[in-house]
Amino acid sequence: MNIDGKPHPHSFYRDGEETRVIESVTRENEGVSIRSKIEKLLVLKSTGSAFHGFHRDEYTKLPETWDRILSTEIEAGWQWKMFKNAEEVKSVDFNGAWKAARDITMKVFAEDNSASVQATMYKMCDLILKAVPDIEAVDYALPNKHYFEIGTLQKLGSCESKSLTAS
């Protein structure tokens, strides 16, 4: 993963499945509604991610940690302001906005060392809204792809065997 033109030392993305999506609806007397998305952006950082300070109860299984591997498949979406007509739509730099949203997403993912993914998503949304004034709302999904140390699954009650086979 390149951040500010340089390879990041511990953040990576998988090239190939990332998809750029647009949804557009035009209604007479209402205008043009456009939603843009980035889907299937698979990223991983090997350090610089924490998960602590959360509510704990009898259902809590994962321990707090101040440094962990974070891997996720990012889905980011943004809703544009309502456009009055096709001429307004043509005047917008959609490519520039997509690049700004993607660059912000990658940079914050790689560099932010927050206590949770939720805090990181908030920062991403805030920066995109500031960078592209024609965007009204931003949303993210960053589901965790967990990587456990050997033995952790047994502690969580997820497996019976004490051996692991890698393939």
Model-assigned labels for residue ranges:
Residues 1-99, 103, 107-167:
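N-terminal intrinsically disordered, cationic/polar leader segments
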